[in-house]
């Protein structure tokens, strides 16, 4: 069982290894199987507040492991990704953990590179006390966006004609290596 949605053209999604789709009708192009809710009920993952009324159904809460729903590691990733994307602090307590948000400025490859290479520098979440010879990739208790298990990072610049899509790859950790633009693979 699954749920998916298309990110609207004027929005940005920050998806940090946890479910962040919630209601059944949150987005115009949203997809899920017909038995999504009844399956969750049958498994004991969801009980409607009022019998037969599924308006309080939350996919992320029902289908995600209980200790992962609003888990600190993933909350920090989404919060800090949104902070960079919006150029303002993001309050999980007040603004939640949405699937996507309306972008308040153009999304650029530079902005995406900054998000994907982030160790939360300059915030309370930054673990700047690594010590001599250590790096943020050695932090075991904090899962940064760019972390110890990040092997490479890719950006895709989508075009109306899919054949003209440009791929940019860091070919390693994005905080250590620059993104290299690869020309459109099927350009004529």
Question: Model segments located where?
Answer:
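C-terminus-biased signal that marks the final domain/tail of proteins
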Residues: 2-188
């Amino acid at each position: 069982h699954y749920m998916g949605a298309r990110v609207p053209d004027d929005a940005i999604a920050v998806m940090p290894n946890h479910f962040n789709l919630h209601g059944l009708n949150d987005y115009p192009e949203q997809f899920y199987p017909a038995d999504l809710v009844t399956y969750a009920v049958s498994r004991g993952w969801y009980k409607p507040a009022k019998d037969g009324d599924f308006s309080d159904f939350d996919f992320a809460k029902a289908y995600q492991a209980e200790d992962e729903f609003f888990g600190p590691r993933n909350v920090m990733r989404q919060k800090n990704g949104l902070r960079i994307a919006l150029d303002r602090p993001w309050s999980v307590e007040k603004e939640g953990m949405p699937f996507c948000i309306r972008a308040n400025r153009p999304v650029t490859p530079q902005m995406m590179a900054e998000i994907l290479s982030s160790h939360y520098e300059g915030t309370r979440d930054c673990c700047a006390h690594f010590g001599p010879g250590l790096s943020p990739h050695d932090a075991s208790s904090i899962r940064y966006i760019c972390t110890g298990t990040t092997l490479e990072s890719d950006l895709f610049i989508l075009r109306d004609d899919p054949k003209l899509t440009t791929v940019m790859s860091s070919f390693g950790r994005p905080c250590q290596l620059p993104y290299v633009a690869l020309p459109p693979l099927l350009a004529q």
